Amino acid sequence: MYPKEEHSAGGISSSVNYLDGAYEYPNPTQTFGTSSPAEPASVGYYPAPPDPHEEHLQTLGGGSSSPLMFAPSSPQLSPYLSHHGGHHTTPHQVSYYLDSSSSTVYRSSVVSSQQAAVGLCEELCSATDRQELYTGSRAAGGFDSGKETRFCAVCSDYASGYHYGVWSCEGCKAFFKRSIQGHNDYVCPATNQCTIDRNRRKSCQACRLRKCYEVGMMKGGIRKDRGGRSVRRERRRSSNEDRDKSSSDQCSRAGVRTTGPQDKRKKRSGGVVSTLCMSPDQVLLLLLGAEPPAVCSRQKHSRPYTEITMMSLLTNMADKELVHMIAWAKKVPGFQDLSLHDQVQLLESSWLEVLMIGLIWRSIHSPGKLIFAQDLILDRSEGECVEGMAEIFDMLLATVARFRSLKLKLEEFVCLKAIILINSGAFSFCSSPVEPLMDNFMVQCMLDNITDALIYCISKSGASLQLQSRRQAQLLLLLSHIRHMSNKGMEHLYRMKCKNRVPLYDLLLEMLDAQRFQSSGKVQRVWSQSEKNPPSTPTTSSSSSNNSPRGGAAAIQSNGACHSHSPDP
């Protein structure tokens, strides 16, 4: 998606070009136009849909969303990256590695916990920062029209600063940072001559990284004296703690009672009057307005499906829906008042459940069918082509039937979906590797508000109080079934990933790895078993054992606040 902004007397109007899906945005303040899809790049090869998260839509920042593909090869070597030959090789597909010890024919299917959290941080920080950066609508973070405008040496977008030795935009800076910090094996699906510009920089990671090196980006091009965001944040935190301690000591000597950090957080949270003091009908209206647009698959698929075809379709849809799920979450009342750490943790803990309840709602009026998209409708028999998928389809269809029998209303659905998001991180355990939420008080207040909105929806039916209470219990009890299906889907998706049966896109991959670090018990045992028994085909999934078990929250703290960027089973 490539938004174009035009300033007029009435404000900012936007026109959007969607290359990979048909979306309808009902928005009273903006008008969107839709252009025709782009033509294929060449006969027999269709470029991967451009990842919309680097554009004006509030989405996650990451690498290319192009599907994984077997990358056998013995082609030309890059002068900037070392090439490793693989057992499976075909012309015009080159594997690039930043680590000479790597050996694989797949794009790396594992990102570190830090990378996953950084990508999600970039998405959650993207909306306001990007608008300020490119439109200059605000003084803070915007370009000064009186100063010289510089452009990114890699993609020719507006440069946000001097990064890694060259002028570059936030997207290319973050991409290069992830590439040199992670263990990424990029493969060009074409001829290593892809055009890298603002509109196509996401289409090929291998060529984008090659161009980064060509224009002079280097790992050593960092100002050592500045440290990083995490270093500066740690300095500020230490300074604040010292100041608070000093002031506390002075007040204690003077006999004045001081307020602790926890009380300060509660006081700050309680001060968010606009969110916490909303009436149930106001919360309900906001949730209805936050609903994401319908998504189309836009992929050519012919029946009967094979295992790889089916998994490719479903993971492609999941990746597209994740982009819109992030934008939806940011519109949930109170969500953006949370710290970035808490936003990331809630999303990483609930993403598959949120996608599943959306699938259930779309399928509620189609008995025996699962409506993954307007142009992707499947039944149970079609899921049998994938090992273990039929069981998940059965559970989904049974849950759809139960919601259908309850005659679920749209207002109730939006409340249940928001409850899934907020309740996913409401409780933490000492044995969990995930750090607890920073502001449990605020999260609990949000949960209470949304629960009140659900009660308000049910009360409008005019039924007796007993029937209203019973319906509320019936709806909330079904959320445990969705959690169970989510765990099953996570096990299945990771098993398919380890077998290289599925092309994992960057955003989906980040969410899957983050969920892995947060999981325990049966899910963790299944993953461990999968890693101990890798398939005979060389893959990069074994490298996941080198990742730290600390997930999104720890990575957020180590990286600090981020700048703009950004399965269904």
Curated annotation (Swiss-Prot):
It comes from the Eukaryota. Keywords: DNA-binding, Lipid-binding, Metal-binding, Nucleus, Receptor, Steroid-binding, Transcription, Transcription regulation, Zinc, Zinc-finger. One of its GO terms (biological process) is response to xenobiotic stimulus. InterPro entries: Est_rcpt/est-rel_rcp, Estr_rcpt, Estr_rcpt_N, NHR-like_dom_sf, Nucl_hrmn_rcpt_lig-bd, Nuclear_hormone_rcpt_NR3, Nuclear_hrmn_rcpt, Znf_hrmn_rcpt. Residues 237-247 have a biased composition (Basic and acidic residues). Residues 218-278 are annotated as: Hinge. Residues 538-549 have a biased composition (Low complexity). Residues 152-217 bind DNA. GO terms for molecular function: estradiol binding; estrogen response element binding; nuclear estrogen receptor activity; nuclear receptor activity; steroid hormone binding; zinc ion binding. Pfam families: Hormone_recep (PF00104), Oest_recep (PF02159), zf-C4 (PF00105). Residues 28-37, 523-532 have a biased composition (Polar residues). Residues 28-65, 223-271, 523-569 are annotated as: Disordered. Residues 1-151 are annotated as: Modulating. It is found in: Nucleus. Residues 279-515 form the NR LBD domain. The steroid hormones and their receptors are involved in the regulation of eukaryotic gene expression and affect cellular proliferation and differentiation in target tissues. Binds DNA as a homodimer. Can form a heterodimer with ER-beta. Belongs to the nuclear hormone receptor family. NR3 subfamily. This is Estrogen receptor. It comes from Danio rerio (Zebrafish). The gene is esr1.
